[in-house]
Structure formats: C-alpha cells, structure tokens
Regions:
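A glycine-rich beta-to-alpha transition motif near the start of alpha/beta enzyme domains, typified by
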Residues: 1-62, 73-74, 92, 97-229
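Ligand-binding beta-strand-loop-alpha-helix segment within the catalytic cores
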Residues: 70-72, 82
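N-terminal, positively charged, Ser/Thr/Ala/Gly-biased leader segments
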Residues: 79-83, 88-90
C-alpha cells in the first residue's frame, strides 16, 4: 500500500504501509506525479518513508530512475536453511537488510526453507524490511522474498527495486568494478541497475524501470491504520 500527500505540489512525499523504503513504489510515484503534471523538471527530489534524506529522482524518455539508499556494509556469512549451510552475502542499509544467496535453481522446498529462516530470526527494530534474494548469477535472475515486521508480511515478490540494487552492489563488490546498466531479471520483469564504488565499502547505486498505469480507483483506508513519515 502506498499513500501520498500533496501540498500544492510543493510537499511531495511517499509513505509505505510499514513505513519502509521501496524503490519500485518510488518509481511508480514518479509516474503518478508525472501523469498529473505535478513535476516540472527532469531531475528532482522526493521524500520517501524509510529514508532520512530526500531521494534523487530522474525522468528519462523511457524510464524512471531512483538513487537508492547507501549501503552500510557488505559481509560474507553462512545461513542455515533446514539442515544445510548456504553461503550468503549480507548487505545492510539504514532501515533494511538483504541477504543474497547464490543458487543454481529454485523450487518450492527451497522457498519454504528461506521463509522458515526469515520467520525464525529476531530482527533488529531498525530494520523496516528484511529481504532474501535467491540469485541465479548466470541468468542475472532473482527471486525476492520480502518481510516487513511491522505488518507481519512475508511475500515472494514479482519485482523488487531495492533487491535489484543490492544485486548491483554485490556484482560491484565481487568484481571490484563499477557496473553500468546491469539488467536484473525477476519474475515480473527487469530492472536496470548501475553501481559505482565511491569509497571504502561505499556504493552509489541507481535503479531504472518502466512504469505504466494499468488501473485507477478509489481506496478507503481507516484513519487509525495510516502511518506517518
């Protein structure tokens, strides 16, 4: 669920239902604002939940681009899924954390083990979102599982912008080379990622994607369920 508040077009902000940050929702929000002629420039900033500073955004002819939150740390570790140990890369941010697991194939049993792992952990309260990306590197393909503790959700998503960004960071980390327009494929489509190393364990990362409006309508939400940015 995304909500937005507009104050004569000067105070644009996006608030997610779990107060988390979402790259895909930010791209969708840019599209929403552009359709309603509420943005006048190709490059601008938006305030988004889960991010303490304004988010840099760009409008291209075919894509919307979002500068992603900065990485705090990339760490190699092992996670136990069922009876097996898997090598994983832990990528942490201000308000969310991702685990990337390299795999050759993904089946229902593997997905269930990942769900069990996420559900069994006690996550630090700073993390609004926990994500696990099952990454088939040869196909540049991910299966993203997203958990939002505040609302108790645990969903295999068709597309995850922040997960795609973490893949860009990981490829940069593993190759020690900046990447430009790296295609991250997902069940629901593809996202373009660029990642540049800007310091010790620091990465400047952007995602680009295409957005179209498929339906419009009115949403009625109980006031007490709404979150504040």
């Amino acid at each position: 669920i995304e909500s937005n508040n507009l104050n004569h077009g000067d105070d644009c902000r996006l608030v997610m239902s779990g107060n988390e940050f979402c790259g895909n929702a930010t791209m969708s929000y840019i599209h929403y604002l552009k359709e309603r002629l509420l943005i006048q420039h190709q490059q601008f900033q938006l305030r988004v939940s889960g991010c303490s500073h304004p988010v840099e955004c760009k409008v291209h002819s075919q894509h919307y681009e979002v500068t992603m939150p900065k990485v705090h740390q990339v760490k190699e570790r092992f996670v136990k899924l069922g009876d097996q140990q898997f090598k994983a890369f832990e990528i942490s941010y201000d308000t969310y954390i991702h685990y990337v697991l390299m795999c050759d194939g993904v089946d229902l049993a593997m997905k269930q083990r990942v769900e069990d792992f996420v559900s069994a952990q006690t996550w630090h309260q700073q993390f609004k979102t926990i994500g696990v990306m099952l990454f088939q590197q040869d196909k540049q393909f991910i299966y993203p599982l997203i958990h939002i503790p505040k609302i108790g959700s645990l969903i295999w998503e068709n597309s995850c912008g922040s997960g795609a960004a973490s893949i860009g960071v990981l490829v940069n980390y593993l190759t020690n080379h900046d990447i430009q327009d790296y295609l991250v494929n997902q069940p629901g489509g593809s996202i373009i990622v660029s990642s540049r190393k800007s310091g010790q364990n620091e990465y400047q990362t952007t995602i680009k994607g295409q957005v179209s409006t498929v339906a419009t309508g009115q949403a009625y939400i109980e006031q007490e369920t709404m979150t504040q940015i």
